Amino acid sequence: KPKLGKLESVIMGIIGAKPLVDLMHAEAEANWIQQNEPEIWQQVHNFLLLSGYHNYKLTGNYKDAVASTVGFIPFDYKTQEWADQKDWKWRAMPIRSEMLPEVLPAGSVLGEITEAAAEQTGIPEGLPLIACGSDKACEVLGTGCIDNETGSLSYGSLATLNITSDKYLEAIPFYPAYPGVIPNTFNIEMMIQRGYWMVSWFKKEFGLQEEQLAKEKNLQPETLFDELLAKVPPGSDGLMLQPYWSPSNGDGPETRGAIIGFNEDHTRAHLYRAMIEGLTYALRESKELLEKRTKKSISRLVVSGGGSQSDEVMQITADIFGMTVLRPHNFETSSL
């Protein structure tokens, strides 16, 4: 357990931060390695996230982008620097400050491609490697979400709603706003775990017909699911789905999803539409919470991710949010 002092533990409990302390201690990868592979942890010289490891292999430098620094690590997301040595995070995991890379804002030079990396990758030797950001931070920027009045909806395996702010603000107390790709900005995020992963779940459990037909027509099965949505009226004839297959936004581990309102007339098409509607209503709730926290109205929504390829899904999104929604020509906005 984190080695917190008695007074510190009491304060954490009073302000409601103790569950987050326990979560970080339980989920930090460094703790797992130390506890399950102690002989490996004893040999650890540097502790890098995946982006930092790639940077090291390409340049030989222990450097990473500020906007890539997302995880269970001793990072101060408000100052966008490694946490002060007095911070409790250092006592929640075995990482020492000398193990961590230097972090630089997006646009900074992390180093140059080494001879060895050039031989292995074909990238020209000496080419500067520029700091950028995490996949989500790049996706938010790619949708043009550069202020707190534009919402970036991501319809991926993890469904999210992000806004960008120049002020640090936690949508859920003690859950940080992560660094944006634009220096000195923050991405304030709400998420639905197992979001559009549910489409994969539906395909596996109920989509054999679409899978077989898609194979014959050389299509993706998901493109045929639009026909199911079109068969069912808005509201799914009373069938409702609560999309919390996994806890989201600080919910407790007891959180579960629910499908409510079945009758003899409901079909798998009703289930699919209820699933899409339930996800969208959960994201609308996230929008309303963000607006309440920031005291700003989100006047523009841009949608990316695999789910945005569906015209029916986009129409459902517009109807439930009650506003025009936009999608880029390329749904993989992280690459933009």
Language-model segments: what does each one mean?
Residues 1-216:
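Glycine-rich phosphate-binding/catalytic subdomain of phosphoryl-transfer
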Residues 25-28, 194-197, 220, 237, ...:
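A generic structural signal for residues located within well-ordered alpha-helices
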Residues 64-68, 227, 247:
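N-terminal entrance/gating region of PLP-dependent enzymes' catalytic architecture
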Residues 133-134, 331-335:
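Short glycine/threonine-rich catalytic loop with a Thr-x-Gly-x-Asp
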Residues 171, 175-176, 220, 256-261:
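Conserved catalytic-core motifs characterized by acidic clusters
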Residues 185, 224-228, 246:
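Glycine-rich, charged/polar anion/phosphate-binding loops
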Residues 217-232:
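Short, well-structured alpha-helical segments that form the helix of a local strand-helix-strand
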Residues 231-333:
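Activation-segment/catalytic-loop signature of the eukaryotic protein kinase fold
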